[in-house]
């Protein structure tokens, strides 16, 4: 529950920024939010591994899907905000969008599932963010 609340807070705080600040801080805010979530997950790594690997039938079984839905909604809000700044209209097939966002979260949680040492997980998470940021910039016309 707490990681979901943390994620929602990061999204909400970002949406409170002015449109110009959102554009300028997109990557840094995403990176710091991912780092906070990573730190939180590693503080309770064994619990998170159980949630990620053995939560079928519990209230946690859809954790990643819930995060994906929140991220997709936040992406739409961000795209609309960017349109007001003069950026092109955001057009993406909803299935592809869902696949891309699901891929991000699945990849993010792989460090827990595969017991990646924390220092490596930090590096991988930063590279994951860089990779996805570049792709989203291309898709969004930045």
Task: Give residue spans per PLM region.
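Hydrophobic alpha-helical connector segments
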Residues: 2-43
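Solvent-exposed, amphipathic alpha-helical segments
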Residues: 2-13, 47, 103-114
């Amino acid at each position: 529950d707490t990681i979901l609340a943390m994620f929602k807070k990061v999204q909400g705080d970002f949406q409170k920024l002015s449109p110009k600040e959102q554009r300028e801080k997109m990557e840094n805010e995403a990176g710091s939010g991912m780092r906070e979530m990573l730190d939180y997950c590693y503080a309770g790594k064994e619990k998170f591994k159980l949630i990620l690997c053995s939560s079928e039938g519990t209230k946690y079984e859809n954790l990643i899907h819930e995060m994906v839905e929140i991220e997709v909604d936040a992406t739409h809000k961000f795209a609309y905000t960017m349109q007001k700044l003069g950026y092109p209209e955001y057009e993406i097939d909803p299935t592809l969008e869902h696949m891309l966002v699901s891929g991000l979260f699945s990849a993010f949680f792989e460090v827990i599932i595969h017991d990646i040492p924390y220092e490596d997980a930090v590096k991988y998470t930063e590279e994951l963010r860089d990779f996805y940021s570049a792709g989203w910039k291309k898709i969004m016309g930045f």
